[in-house]
């Protein structure tokens, strides 16, 4: 039996808390860095070898893609929390049921969303006020990209299973392989074969397919409670209900929040393709802070899920403090780095000075306030890990969706400029940080009383 096949479940119910969280979070953070590299490399190569209009076309569809993927990732997080709780309770039968039900659901969801996205590509792009001069390229990119959704969704569910078992390094490894392949294929399809935005979408799809194959192969040969058997990928009714009860609030939360960002993107689109390109450039950079932070939130949910399942409430409290230290230092640190090195970073994407100007403007409004998101996401992960996924859903829907929609409808017409669009983010982050902190304090009081 190889070392690979002897892989063990990593339980977080004992040992040094800070060390456990840090070493579990690092592969997740790096994994999200690599996942963000998929779209970032597309943008860099498209911007430099095809042009600013093509870059704007890819950027204008990014929010649609994010809505779909984020919703599915929310469900994967919910499944991961259920698996983590079953592992913490040392219930092997429920672990087996949760793993295979999660994969069955992700396959069905992947097929449905792939078909819907392919059929509705043009109406979705047109609904976002996409300028006519980039409309066709936007439709082409999103249509081709939609056929890779099933691979992305299935991979994210497998990664959720690996992360729930404490094996975040394995999903990082496969993302590293896929990211290198993505860069090579981007250069081949865009630079050599001159395939434009279509080449970027095809390269991303192939890379995601390979990540899916690599990770599936691993979970089929591993020798632990999370081993996958193809014939056992079926729905277990009671477990499906439990997973959906946990995953749907997180999925809806992500989807609706991202939908509000689609409205914001639509507001940006009216300012022309150079503003779209600049805003799109910054969103790619922004992903290197936001997505890894979501990984820290996932680590928090996994840690709390296992310890809550084992009844270790005091350990939960200490773990959340450690998570806050990691989350706030990371987000604030990345924000500072972005501001200090803004010129070389932004120049990677394009030589268009107008696009770079708008990207830097977004950076000035976002980077100084990233620390607020550290509080929001760490507390959200902790609350979700305790099985209370409805609470962070309500808080984030209010802060990141309802508040932002009201801003777009009432504040933006008064401000009537690009800066008015940008300002909604730091203000909504502050609202969410305050509300989520209060909810976490209330939760801990209840848990400590019943411990």
Protein language model regions, located:
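Transmembrane helical elements of multi-pass membrane transporters/channels
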Residues: 23-42, 144, 178, 207-211, ...
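Helix-terminus/linker motif at the lipid-water interface of multi-pass membrane proteins
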Residues: 37-55, 125-132, 188-195, 255-284, ...
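Small-residue-rich hydrophobic transmembrane alpha-helices
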Residues: 55-115, 152-171, 265, 278-341, ...
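Short alpha-helical transmembrane segments in multi-pass integral membrane proteins
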Residues: 1-25, 83-148, 192-248, 304-369, ...
């Amino acid at each position: 039996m190889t070392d690979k096949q002897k892989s063990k479940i990593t339980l977080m119910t004992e040992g040094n808390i800070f060390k456990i969280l840090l070493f579990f979070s690092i592969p997740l953070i790096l994994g999200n860095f690599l996942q963000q590299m998929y779209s970032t490399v597309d943008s860099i190569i498209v911007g430099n070898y095809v042009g600013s209009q093509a870059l704007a076309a890819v950027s204008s569809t990014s929010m649609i893609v994010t809505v779909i993927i984020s919703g599915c990732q929310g469900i994967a997080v919910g499944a991961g929390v259920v698996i983590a709780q079953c592992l913490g309770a040392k219930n092997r039968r429920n672990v087996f049921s949760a793993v295979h039900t999660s994969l069955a659901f992700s396959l069905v969801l992947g097929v449905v969303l792939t078909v819907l996205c392919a059929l509705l590509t043009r109406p979705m792009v047109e609904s976002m006020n996409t300028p006519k001069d980039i409309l066709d390229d936007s439709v082409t990119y999103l249509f081709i990209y939609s056929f890779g959704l099933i691979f992305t969704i299935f991979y994210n569910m497998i990664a959720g299973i690996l992360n729930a078992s404490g094996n975040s390094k394995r999903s990082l490894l496969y993302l590293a392989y896929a990211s290198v392949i993505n860069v090579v294929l981007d250069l081949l399809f865009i630079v050599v074969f001159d395939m434009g935005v279509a080449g970027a979408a095809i390269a991303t799809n192939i890379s995601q397919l390979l990540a899916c194959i690599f990770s599936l192969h691993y979970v089929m040969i591993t020798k632990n409670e999370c081993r996958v058997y193809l014939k056992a990928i079926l729905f277990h009714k009671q477990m499906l209900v439990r997973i959906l009860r946990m995953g749907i609030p997180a999925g809806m939360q992500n989807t609706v929040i991202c939908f509000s960002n689609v409205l914001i993107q639509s507001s940006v689109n009216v300012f022309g393709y150079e503003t779209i390109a600049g805003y799109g450039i910054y969103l790619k950079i922004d992903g290197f802070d936001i997505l890894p932070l979501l990984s820290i939130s996932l680590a928090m949910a996994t840690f709390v899920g296992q310890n809550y399942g084992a009844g270790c409430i005091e350990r939960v409290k200490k773990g959340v403090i450690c998570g806050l230290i990691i989350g706030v230092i990371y987000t604030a640190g990345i924000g500072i780095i972005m501001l200090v090195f803004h010129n070389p970073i932004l120049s990677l994407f394009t030589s268009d000075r107008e696009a770079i100007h708008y990207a830097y403007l977004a950076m000035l409004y976002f980077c100084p306030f990233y620390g607020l998101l550290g509080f929001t996401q760490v507390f959200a992960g902790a609350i979700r890990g305790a099985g209370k996924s409805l609470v962070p859903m309500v808080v984030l829907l209010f802060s990141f969706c309802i508040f932002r929609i009201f801003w777009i409808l009432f504040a933006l017409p008064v401000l009537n400029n690009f800066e008015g669009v940008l300002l909604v983010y730091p203000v909504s982050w502050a609202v969410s940080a305050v509300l989520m902190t209060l909810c976490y304090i209330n939760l801990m009081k209840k848990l400590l009383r019943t411990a």
